[in-house]
């Protein structure tokens, strides 16, 4: 597609590189921004720059944060005894929206997937051992997607740490097999957390 301006073409190229946005949608968004006051486009640009430069990863759970320790980990209203193990920040947001969970989190940063070249060494599994060594955790809750990769990841972690004093559980399968956690509705996800099941080799 030819554009009347190289600047416009560059903007369309960059916007269309975002997930789920094709070139036609990117063009509509670029044209929309051009119709807005300059302050609107500048505000968006500054927000994106701040997103890249200023956002931090929580040292405790690997969540996104404005500070070295996120609000959840630093809250005295959240128990240290429950740690919910999830794949990424979208899962934390989904679970928080249920209002049913009062523990803390540990974000793995993905799941074991040999097809995509992701092994245990690419995940934040050492942080689980760190939590165990601190001696505060009573239960780890697996809240991973109901996929083969999610099940493989949970099983690997369980096998690695099963001989510890900590209990392992998994959210109840109100989530359909093959579904990612972030797409579950809040009511089903909340019930899955409240009705979680003990995790063991015979009941993954």
Identify the role of each PLM range:
Residues 25, 37, 52-55, 65, ...:
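Conserved NTP-handling cores and scaffolds of large molecular machines
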Residues 129-204:
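Long C-terminal interaction/binding lobes of large macromolecular proteins
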Residues 19, 38, 51, 63-64, ...:
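Conserved phosphate/pyrophosphate-binding and hydrolysis machinery centered on Walker-type P-loop NTPases
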Residues 12, 55, 67, 122-129:
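Short, well-ordered alpha-helical scaffold segments within catalytic/effector domains
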Residues 2-9, 17, 30-92, 198:
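Cys/His-rich Zn2+-binding cysteine-cluster or related metal-binding knuckle/ribbon modules and their
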Residues 8-16, 27, 33-36, 158-171, ...:
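S-adenosyl-L-methionine-dependent methyltransferase catalytic core, i.e., the SAM/SAH-binding region
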Residues 26, 75-144:
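Extended interfacial segments that mediate partner engagement and assembly in macromolecular machines
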């Amino acid at each position: 597609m030819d554009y009347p301006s190289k600047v416009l073409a560059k903007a369309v190229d960059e916007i269309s590189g975002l997930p789920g946005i094709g070139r036609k949608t990117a063009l509509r968004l670029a044209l929309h921004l051009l119709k807005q006051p300059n302050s609107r486009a500048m505000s968006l640009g500054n927000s994106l720059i701040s997103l890249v430069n200023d956002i931090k990863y929580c040292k405790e759970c690997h969540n996104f944060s404005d500070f070295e320790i996120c609000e959840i980990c630093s809250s005295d209203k959240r128990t240290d005894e429950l740690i919910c193990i999830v794949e990424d920040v979208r899962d934390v947001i989904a679970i928080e929206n249920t209002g049913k969970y009062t523990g803390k989190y540990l974000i793995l940063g993905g799941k074991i997937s040999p097809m995509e070249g992701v092994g245990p060494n690419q995940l934040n599994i050492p942080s689980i051992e760190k939590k165990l060594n601190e001696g505060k955790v009573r239960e780890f809750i697996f809240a991973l997607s109901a996929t083969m990769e999610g099940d493989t990841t949970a099983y690997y972690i369980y096998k690695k740490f099963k001989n510890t004093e900590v209990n392992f559980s998994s959210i109840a399968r109100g989530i359909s097999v093959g579904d990612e956690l972030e797409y579950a509705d809040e009511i089903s996800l909340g019930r899955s957390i409240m009705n979680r099941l003990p995790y063991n080799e015979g009941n993954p």
